[in-house]
């Protein structure tokens, strides 16, 4: 079993760090914000809570929630313009510090690429380092489903992305950071997992993560030492 001090060393020597987005890099759950914007917040929030607790297979939960929301292309664009996601305090500095150390930073999300790319731009993360679900629209902009071939559409999808990154770039040490069960499940193949509870505490993650933080300042401090 890896000790806490070994985990800290792993983090400081990682050549890639992968962040979950909803409730980790940003304060909100993107799908809940979209539901609120489209007027179906209560039903969708309950489904998100069940999905996060691991009670529903991820793809089933995503399909059900999107069937309720039926977001159009215009609604997604208006959401970003009128209610842009809020970055979690400390994330901008942490990502910037990692990039200064030539660590590759990736965003791996079960949320939507259109929202995650908006977040990536704020953090100077290239879109090639973004893995998320793609919404599909008909030619008139109405909702047409989502791309079910994306690894992030499946339970265990974040682990698949990390496995792909290791194979493609030959990273020696990849760290996964996130708030949810799907993030914790990505280790292995990630070499270490850091649980994050700065926006919402998922008890299952808090109880099982070997390293659990509630403020990104703690990780910044590790890099400065």
Curated annotation (Swiss-Prot):
EC supergroup of this enzyme: hydrolase
Binding-site residues for phosphate, renumbered to this chain: 53, 182
Binding site for L-serine: 20-22, 109-111, 158
GO biological process: in utero embryonic development; L-serine biosynthetic process; L-serine metabolic process; response to mechanical stimulus; response to nutrient levels; response to testosterone
Record keyword Hydrolase present: yes
Keyword Cytoplasm: yes
UniProt cofactor note: Binds 1 Mg(2+) ion per subunit.
Main location: cytoplasm
N-acetylmethionine modifications at: 1
Enzyme active site: 20, 22
Binding residues for O-phospho-L-serine: 52, 109-111, 158, 182
Similarity section: Belongs to the HAD-like hydrolase superfamily. SerB family.
Self-association and partners: Homodimer.
Protein's recorded name: Phosphoserine phosphatase
Species assigned in the record: Rattus norvegicus
